[in-house]
């Protein structure tokens, strides 16, 4: 792809469009999620997050039984789901009292007029120890949610 940026012509290789630094965070239930940056590709978009767990139990940022709980949302309220099948449990599980960085890929085909307004984590498992002991996962109810507004340049 050839783009014109700040009066300069640039060539994007391997469908890479560009990077944007964001550094915006949101906190709920003693969990802070910071959106560090995003990389845009022709067929998808990645976001790098720093997740801080100040709880006394490990958390899981994605319910593995439901695919649609991590997404990005555009200005038209369209949701683009995360590629959760590419994430290992070690990517989404944050131990108590620790900060972890994870890069998450989303289904989001490039468009020059697409504006991503939010990243969302709708079903954070706030007590992974308790969750992992449930034989009936549907009975577990200790969930959190964080939605982070993406500033527009």
Could you tell me what each predicted segment is?
Residues 1-33, 59-80, 92-153:
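Surface-exposed edge beta-strand/loop patches
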Residues 25, 38-41:
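Short, conserved, surface-exposed binding loops centered on an aromatic residue
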Residues 49-58:
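Asparagine-centered strand-capping/turn motif at beta-strand->loop junctions
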Residues 31-37, 85-90:
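Short structured motifs
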Residues 52, 64, 74, 85-86:
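Low-complexity, intrinsically disordered/propeptide-like segments
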Residues 41-48:
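Short, solvent-exposed loop/turn segments enriched in Ser/Thr/Gly
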